[in-house]
Amino acid sequence: MAILTSKASNIPYPIQYDELHKEAVLQKHFDTASYLSTTHTTRNTMRYFLYFAYDGTNYHGWQVQPNAVTVQLRLEEAMQTLLRVPTPVTGAGRTDTGVNARTMVAHFDTETPLPDPAVFADRLNRLLPPDIAVHRCVPVTDTAHARFDATSRTYKYYAIDHKSPFAERYAWRYRGTLDFDAMNQAAEALYRYTDFTSFSKLHTDVKTNNCRVTYAHWEQEGEGYTFTITADRFLRNMVRAIVGTLVEVGRHKITLDEFCAIIEGRDRGLAGTSMPGKALFLHDVTYPEELFL
């Protein structure tokens, strides 16, 4: 399902596509064998970055896990069908259950260079379900890594204060009023810190909870407010925990000083609740130019 934004609203909404049964797609649109049997005869491993979007509503997050349908699972299934060999993909990050992505990046390797990455992206799209859409496929250096080479990631969180049959699927609806000026003052305080243990999911496998936040701001857009945050990396559940704590500032339940004390306390139990994942979008991921061929 492709994700677009209405001109009159800051809230993303889905464009519906007709369902195509996978076998019918293969029969009608593909000749995989002829696609792979090209003039490229030398076996030369190539790495590619895949840029794609997804609606996370029906998925248990990005990463493959037992007994669950995930975005990575569906993508790797489609890759194997198209390339006819198991093809693992490595994502730029791990979004949680229900979280969406306007731009996710993943890398994968092929033993034979793709004849035309644009054609590959188009054919992969035809195999994927309607709620996953590939934007483009680009060749990169052999050592380029979608996760470790990312220089920044940007997330957006959408909030509305009224009932909307179109927006509520991808936005958090709040009751009463929020002091967004106070929330932005607290958001600016994030620049002064690097240890965000208080906003991290417990018992994760990361070696450090240090991140460098370079932008964090609430802005009125269309019919609601959008929180945009950019950092070099994010911890599990970090953005939703930050938003939940900023909401407590906006409701005057805690002061700016108390918000800072929560960060300095390095204790997840001090921070606010984790906000619903449906309103969170991975918006962009950036990389050094030298990675691209």
PLM segments and residue spans:
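Extreme N-terminal basic, low-complexity initiation segments
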Residues: 1-13
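Positively charged N-terminal leader segments that act as targeting/secretion signals
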Residues: 18-34
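Juxtamembrane/membrane-water interface recognition
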Residues: 10-16, 20-22, 41
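N-terminal polybasic/positive-inside topogenic patches
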Residues: 7, 32-40
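Structured-RNA-binding interfaces characteristic of tRNA pseudouridine synthases
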Residues: 40-293
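Generic N-terminal simple sequence motifs
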Residues: 8-10, 29, 272
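Compositionally biased, intrinsically disordered low-complexity regions
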Residues: 4, 25-26, 95, 100
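Short, linear, compositionally biased motifs with a strong N-terminal bias
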Residues: 15-18, 36, 96
